[in-house]
Amino acid sequence: MQVFREKQLLIQAIQKVKSDGKSIGLVPTMGALHEGHLSLVTNALKDSDQVIVSIFVNPTQFDNPEDLEKYPRNLNKDIELLEKETSDIWVFSPTANELYGDKILSQNFDFEGLESVMEGEFRAGHFNGVGTVVKHLFEVITPDKAFFGEKDFQQLQIIRKLIEKTGLPVEIVGCPILREDSGLARSSRNERLSFQNRKEAAFIYEVLQNANRLFGTESAEHTTNWVENQFKNNQHLKLEYFEIADSETLKKVNKKEKGKQYRAFIAAYSDGIRLIDNIALNN
């Protein structure tokens, strides 16, 4: 498996692949890889001649320095996990200065309001940081396709908007959420949960499934109130937000409209660890 730390060496290798008429698939990650990431890699391998996995803990998307410091990092373990899939993958793991240059700054984007709701409401500047690093990665790697998980659905829509705004020739592929047997969405943060916390956190997906059923016959307001009450009665999890939104615009739904696609989004804390999830709603 080839591991690139310098972007110039990677660019040269990519030019060789592209000159042979082969396609590049990118799976951008912040490391701490798990089965969810591997499912993205599997999708990329089916759809691309050469797959590149970027492993980079991006400082510009953290609004909380403590969160950045605590984010799990183990490059050797990540590489071992990828090698079990295939040794044909390339890994790009630069330092912040290698990727950004001397000034590690976040760029401001106009995401037309997609960035100001839900996650954006609670994490100031987060999506500008995401947009900045993804734009840098796309410019260095020039992928034909990039693969993102639907667990971060808001991020997925923002990346699609980034492509629309910048005109970068990258096809964005959304991949289904991978879940643990309990239903808990796979996440790097799950590593920080105790065995008991992990069991208790399965409640999040259970509530989402019930909200989906309820939304089939009830209003968005009624469904939201029901979810909030479920968390008021739960001693182990603290709800940060639950929102039903239009799948495309991410605008909060007040009244259901026929033919529209909706999604429920949730963020909750388990013993101080923030977990997010979402589900497509039947209308």
From Swiss-Prot:
Please name the Pfam families in this protein's record. Answer: Pantoate_ligase (PF02569)
Annotated (R)-pantoate binding lies at Q61, Q155
Q: Pathway of this protein?
A: Cofactor biosynthesis; (R)-pantothenate biosynthesis; (R)-pantothenate from (R)-pantoate and beta-alanine: step 1/1
Any idea where this protein resides? Cytoplasm
Q: Indicate the enzyme's highest-level EC class.
A: ligase
A Gene Ontology biological process in which this protein takes part is: pantothenate biosynthetic process
Q: Reaction catalysed by this chain?
A: (R)-pantoate + beta-alanine + ATP = (R)-pantothenate + AMP + diphosphate + H(+)
Can you list the GO cellular component terms from the UniProt entry?
A: cytosol
Q: Which purpose does this protein serve, as stated in its record?
A: Catalyzes the condensation of pantoate with beta-alanine in an ATP-dependent reaction via a pantoyl-adenylate intermediate.
Beyond the main fields, what else does the record say?
The reaction proceeds by a bi uni uni bi ping pong mechanism.
Record-stated family: Belongs to the pantothenate synthetase family.
Among NCBIfam families, the record links this protein to:
cyt_tran_rel, panC
User: What is the designated name of this protein?
Assistant: Pantothenate synthetase
Q: Origin organism of this chain?
A: Christiangramia forsetii (strain DSM 17595 / CGMCC 1.15422 / KT0803)
Gene name linked to the record: panC
